[in-house]
Amino acid sequence: MVEKNTYFIGVGRRKTAVATVKLMSGNGVIVIDGKPIEERFTRIQERNVILNPMMVTDTMGKFNAVIKVLGGGVTGQSGAIAHGIARALEKTDEKLRAALKSNGLLTRDDRTKERKKPGLKRARKAPQYTKR
């Protein structure tokens, strides 16, 4: 499927987080910012989001991943990593594209925090209305 020394790069984004994913053939070791996935993301929900592209394409123990992630919080980072893994998996084999696309893993989730408007307390919350 993939030669030993080749690797595939995918860049994923979610909210303000950006993840650069390097996939290479291996036995399923995932390292995020120099730490194993279990140490970096302790909650099972985030790990499931990250591993979802590999579960969908049935490539769970076939690739090692070295991931660098910048910005955002835990949810944004896990979403960015999943997006990056999906993009890198697509480069490994074009046949995986259909499975990834049908599960919405190649689509960039563009929902970001809405900016605060002048005259309002938050993006949409207005100060309390007083009649008199």
UniProtKB/Swiss-Prot annotation:
Organism: Dehalococcoides mccartyi (strain CBDB1)
SUPFAM superfamilies: Ribosomal protein S5 domain 2-like
Record's keyword annotation contains Hydrolase: no
HAMAP family tied to this protein: Ribosomal_uS9_B
UniProt GO molecular function: RNA binding; structural constituent of ribosome
GO cellular component: cytosolic small ribosomal subunit
Family note: Belongs to the universal ribosomal protein uS9 family.
NCBIfam families cross-referenced by the UniProt entry: PRK00132.1 (NF001099)
Gene3D superfamilies named among the record's database cross-references: 3.30.230.10
Disordered as annotated region, ranges: 103-132
Source taxon at top rank: Bacteria
Gene Ontology biological process terms from the UniProt entry: translation
Keywords for this protein: Ribonucleoprotein, Ribosomal protein
Protein name, entry field: Small ribosomal subunit protein uS9
Feature: compositional bias, Basic residues: 114-132
